[in-house]
């Protein structure tokens, strides 16, 4: 069966950051998980940790093994949900369409699902059932995105914090990290009339990618030289530890807003004790009304039928897959009957043209009835009547006398 293990929706960030996955160990995790699972996809983003897998049964021993592989404390088991079969499948489809994103309808999740899928595919960590599930879910996400036209009102944690900071008249910025979220943040910032932005990174070669004169690329270790002169700091690193500590922020100076888009968090919560500083983590940010939330919800809700359509197509594929062995058996029987009939005819007829004509007619007739039987079998399977249909078809075509 297919199942998904993930973190419950309302789990506080203090717990979520203890249940994250180290991206640089992705392949290592897959190898270890495959000792216990038949197929697995790890979906790990800055705000989501989910493991989709195929297994014969789920028990607490298996869950303990999974926790052990990720180095999670089993005392956090109560914050984990597990869905199986249809619930798990529906959850994935809803994820790819943006229904479960912290910021409703954000447009990054589909790309993140695709990346996770291809990592498992390249690592040969997928069985056919899980592979086909992700193929249908990704196709569904693409169709949902294009038909609902959410790209007309794009939203992400990056776009929300940039718009908020601009509305608060911030002009001098610092961005920490230049991964997917960091790049997006820089893109949104540079689209506005800002004075300057310091980009703190560990790889200074990134400087060659950015031509905008407002951007100062600095070494990550230099950030504290400039951080107290900023109006706004946006942190989005993949560090497993705090990167902005309370002692890094001066008590005296103009107001500073710090947005922490990372999980685990980049920013020390105690900075909120400094009068001039305001810290917003990803949970706070997700509650900001970006002005388009209602519009996105309405667009998504009116196009939910797309999700149901592709989900049903996957279920149909799964049901039809159950009769695949019978279809192969029927094809073998059809070929045996054809060979037997044409051999009998050849033994009684010496005219080559007659034999060729008979060969085509017998093959055509055999294929017609075989394909018709397969079509009927598929139709009845989707109606739930496959057992009775199978018995009748076997009785007509496959009972040897």
Swiss-Prot record:
Superkingdom of source: Bacteria
- Pathway where this protein functions: Porphyrin-containing compound metabolism; protoporphyrin-IX biosynthesis; 5-aminolevulinate from L-glutamyl-tRNA(Glu): step 1/2
Residues where substrate binds? 45-48, 101, 106-108, 112
What's its catalytic activity? (S)-4-amino-5-oxopentanoate + tRNA(Glu) + NADP(+) = L-glutamyl-tRNA(Glu) + NADPH + H(+)
Marked site (Important for activity) residue numbers: 91
The entry marks the following residues as binding NADP(+), namely: 177-182
Q: Name one GO molecular function term.
A: glutamyl-tRNA reductase activity
> Where's the active site on this chain?
46
Q: Which InterPro entries match?
A: 4pyrrol_synth_GluRdtase, 4pyrrol_synth_GluRdtase_dimer, 4pyrrol_synth_GluRdtase_N, GluRdtase_CS, GluRdtase_N_sf, NAD(P)-bd_dom_sf, Shikm_DH/Glu-tRNA_Rdtase
Indicate yes or no for the key word NADP.
yes
EC number of the protein:
1.2.1.70
Q: Which UniProt keywords apply?
A: NADP, Oxidoreductase, Porphyrin biosynthesis
Q: What else is known?
A: During catalysis, the active site Cys acts as a nucleophile attacking the alpha-carbonyl group of tRNA-bound glutamate with the formation of a thioester intermediate between enzyme and glutamate, and the concomitant release of tRNA(Glu). The thioester intermediate is finally reduced by direct hydride transfer from NADPH, to form the product GSA.
Purpose of the protein: Catalyzes the NADPH-dependent reduction of glutamyl-tRNA(Glu) to glutamate 1-semialdehyde (GSA).
**Tell me, how does this one assemble?**
Homodimer.
Protein family: Belongs to the glutamyl-tRNA reductase family.
Protein name according to UniProt: Glutamyl-tRNA reductase
């Amino acid at each position: 069966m297919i199942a998904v293990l993930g973190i419950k929706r309302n789990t506080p960030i203090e717990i979520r950051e203890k249940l994250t996955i180290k991206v640089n160990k992705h392949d290592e995790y897959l190898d270890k998980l495959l000792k216990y699972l038949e197929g697995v996809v790890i979906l790990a983003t800055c705000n989501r940790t989910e493991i989709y897998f195929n297994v014969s049964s789920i028990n607490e021993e298996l869950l303990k093994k999974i926790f052990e592989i990720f180095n999670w404390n089993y005392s956090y088991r109560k914050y984990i949900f597990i869905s199986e079969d249809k619930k798990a499948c529906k959850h994935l489809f809803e994820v790819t369409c943006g229904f479960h994103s912290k910021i409703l309808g954000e447009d990054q999740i589909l790309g993140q699902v695709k990346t996770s899928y291809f990592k498992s595919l390249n690592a040969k960590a997928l069985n056919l059932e899980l592979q086909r599930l992700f193929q249908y879910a990704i196709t569904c996400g693409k169709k949902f995105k294009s038909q609902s036209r959410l790209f007309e009102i794009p939203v992400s944690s990056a776009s929300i914090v940039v718009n908020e900071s601009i509305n608060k008249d911030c002009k001098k910025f610092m961005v920490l990290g230049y991964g997917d979220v960091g790049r997006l943040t820089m893109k949104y910032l540079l689209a506005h009339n800002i004075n300057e932005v310091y980009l703190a990174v560990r790889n200074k070669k990134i400087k060659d990618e950015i031509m905008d004169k407002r951007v100062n690329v600095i070494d990550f270790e230099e950030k504290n030289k400039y951080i107290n002169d900023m109006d706004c700091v946006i942190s989005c690193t993949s560090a497993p530890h705090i990167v902005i500590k309370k002692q890094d922020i001066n008590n005296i100076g103009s107001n500073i807003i710090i947005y922490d888009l990372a999980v685990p968090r980049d920013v020390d919560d105690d900075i909120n004790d400094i009068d001039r500083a305001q810290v917003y983590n990803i949970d706070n940010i997700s509650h900001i009304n970006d002005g388009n939330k209602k519009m996105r919800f309405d667009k998504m809700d009116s196009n939910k039928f797309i999700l149901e359509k592709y989900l049903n197509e996957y279920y149909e594929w799964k049901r039809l897959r159950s009769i695949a062995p019978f279809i192969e058996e029927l094809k073998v029987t059809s070929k045996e009957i054809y060979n037997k009939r044409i051999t009998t005819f050849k033994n009684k007829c010496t005219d080559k043209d007659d034999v060729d004509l008979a060969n085509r007619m017998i093959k055509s007739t055999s294929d017609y009835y075989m394909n018709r039987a397969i079509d009927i079998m598929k139709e009845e399977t989707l109606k739930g009547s496959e057992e009775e249909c199978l018995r009748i078809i076997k009785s007509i075509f496959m009972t040897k006398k």
